[in-house]
């Protein structure tokens, strides 16, 4: 990974583990900021230390308050908001973050082009609502779209078209099927992070951008992977396919031999053998399958002073393997492995 890509990589990593850590006003049992600024909706908090942020969380609001001009960061989490009128944000053209998690929003009650009119919007989070399809149209400035834990069954063709700055999409925990998203992400050439876990996918979708760094398909119903599916993914580093229905016959020989890959999770499937992976792979999760043999060729094509597997963590617990099944020469191939779990 280059130094130039490290800052955005760290942002993505923090998004994985702290998806809802939006800022300094998270769910305090007291007011950590003191008095609000004079320019603020009376029921909300616009702290003096963060004068362009308005916090309206946990207020049982049914409608969005009037948002004063100059607000850039708007938090409306954990309310009872059901609708957004088209003119709701006409006064806040500088809005950059709009956080609407844990409300009662439905697509039919999000009116017109309410989001696309926000020409500076970068983050739109509508996790834990009642959406049945991806919202849109959206502004081209958007870089972070989170729609997880809804009831989304489709991403309409063109819904994400033109979002050239979009780097993060969360669509996990919805009701998406493969046909309803194939081609939906085409042209998103800045996309680095895509989470489609906990849906109803039976196949891998087509048209994913090759810019992806992190790709999550865990907890679906995927049984096979097309040959050369990941060909062209030159920067893919994290791939999760755990809790699916993968078998040996559904995995072409070298489909996971991706030189950029750092972490691969194939745990909780129905594999009997270990797929071939790149010698650059560092973390490999295969626990709870039906694996009964340990071919070194899955990890090392050739073993020598400078040619060996870079795997540091290998999980094989919950399979049909014991220490006695591991070949002695394994330690030449997996010489940097710090942890090999079998039990």
From Swiss-Prot:
Modified residues (Sulfotyrosine): 20, 22
SMART domains in the record: LRR_BAC, LRR_SD22, LRR_TYP, LRRNT
Signal peptide: 1-18
Keyword Transmembrane helix: no
Disulfide pattern: 300-333
Residue span(s) of domain LRRNT: 31-69
Keyword Aminoacyl-tRNA synthetase: no
GO CC aspect terms: extracellular space
UniProt-listed InterPro entries: Leu-rich_rpt, Leu-rich_rpt_typical-subtyp, LRR_dom_sf, LRRNT, SLRP
GO MF term (any one): collagen binding
Gene3D superfamilies attached to this UniProt entry: Ribonuclease Inhibitor (3.80.10.10)
Family per record: Belongs to the small leucine-rich proteoglycan (SLRP) family. SLRP class II subfamily.
Keywords from the UniProt entry: Disulfide bond, Extracellular matrix, Glycoprotein, Leucine-rich repeat, Proteoglycan, Pyrrolidone carboxylic acid, Repeat, Secreted, Signal, Sulfation
Protein name per its UniProtKB record: Lumican
């Amino acid at each position: 990974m280059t130094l130039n890509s490290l800052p955005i990589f760290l942002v993505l990593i923090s998004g994985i583990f702290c998806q809802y850590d939006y800022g300094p006003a998270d769910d305090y049992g007291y007011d950590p900021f003191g008095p609000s600024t004079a320019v603020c909706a009376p029921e909300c908090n616009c702290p003096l230390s963060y004068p362009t942020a308005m916090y309206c969380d946990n207020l049982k609001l049914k409608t969005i308050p009037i948002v004063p001009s100059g607000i850039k960061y708007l938090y409306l989490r954990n309310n009872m908001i059901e609708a957004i009128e088209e003119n709701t944000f006409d006064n806040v053209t500088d809005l950059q973050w709009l956080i609407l998690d844990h409300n009662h929003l439905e697509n039919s009650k999000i009116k017109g082009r309410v989001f696309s009119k926000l020409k500076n919007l970068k983050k739109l989070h509508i996790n834990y609502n009642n959406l049945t399809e991806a919202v849109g149209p959206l502004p081209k400035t958007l870089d972070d779209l989170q729609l997880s834990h809804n009831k989304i069954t489709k991403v309409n063709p063109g819904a994400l078209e033109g979002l050239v700055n979009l780097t993060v999409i969360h669509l996990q925990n919805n009701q998406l099927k493969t046909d309803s998203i194939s081609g939906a992400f085409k042209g998103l050439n800045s996309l680095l992070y895509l989470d489609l876990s906990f849906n109803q996918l039976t196949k891998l979708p087509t048209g994913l951008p090759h810019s992806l760094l992190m790709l999550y398909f865990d907890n679906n119903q995927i049984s096979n992977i097309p040959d050369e599916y990941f060909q062209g993914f030159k920067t893919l580093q994290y791939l999760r396919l755990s809790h699916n229905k993968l078998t040996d016959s559904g995995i072409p020989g070298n489909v996971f031999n991706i030189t950029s890959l750092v972490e691969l999770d194939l745990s909780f499937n129905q594999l009997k053998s270990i797929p071939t992976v790149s010698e650059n792979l560092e973390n490999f999760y295969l626990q709870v399958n039906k694996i009964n043999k340990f071919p070194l060729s899955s990890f090392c094509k050739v073993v020598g002073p400078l040619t060996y597997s870079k795997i540091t963590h290998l999980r094989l617990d919950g399979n049909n393997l014991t220490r006695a099944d591991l070949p002695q020469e394994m330690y030449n191939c997996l010489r940097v492995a710090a942890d090999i779990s079998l039990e």
